[in-house]
């Protein structure tokens, strides 16, 4: 079952979303300390308005346990969504510059992850299909995401769902494929 995340899902969702974020999680939190990173990301998650707010996260639950999570938002909202994150960085004396991972006209899948014990059951596909539904409900014309160039299997998975590779992006010193799926 796919539901809007709740603030009480913070610990599990941050653990899952960090699987997808990899090193970018530390960059976003403004720290290289793992414990502090989790603390800061959990604070962002329970907040109302930022990239990884619970309001932008959808969870897949099985037997009432969160086993998958997906963070999505509209690229045109990034200035508003980044305000709290940049304020946190400033408080930590960090010169954080957030990358525009998506374009202003894209409904963006920022991160998606499924608990390792539940992979291979189609949960990621269901979450992505849900992103298409949300995008359509909000009158967005396309859904986007990025895939690390070193992950050809992941790229093939997204292409099998109808995403088209439209180019490359360099974000936080990593190279990514930029993928788009038009919403009809």
Residues covered by each model-derived region:
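Conserved GNAT-fold acetyl-CoA-binding loop/helix
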Residues: 22-45, 56, 90-91
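Conserved acyl-donor/pantetheine-binding loop and adjacent beta-alpha core of acyl/acetyltransferases
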Residues: 74-107, 111
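A short beta-loop-alpha structural element at the N-terminal edge
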Residues: 1-15, 23-28
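Conserved acetyl-CoA-binding loop-helix of GNAT-fold acetyltransferases
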Residues: 114, 120-133, 137, 156-160
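C-terminal "cap" of GNAT-fold acetyltransferases
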Residues: 141-155, 160-162, 168-184
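Conserved beta-strand in the GNAT
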Residues: 59, 65-74, 108, 113
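Conserved GNAT acetyl-CoA-binding A-motif
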Residues: 106-107, 119, 128, 135-148
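A short helix-loop-beta-strand connector motif used in the catalytic cores of GNAT acetyltransferases and
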Residues: 46-59, 76-80, 108
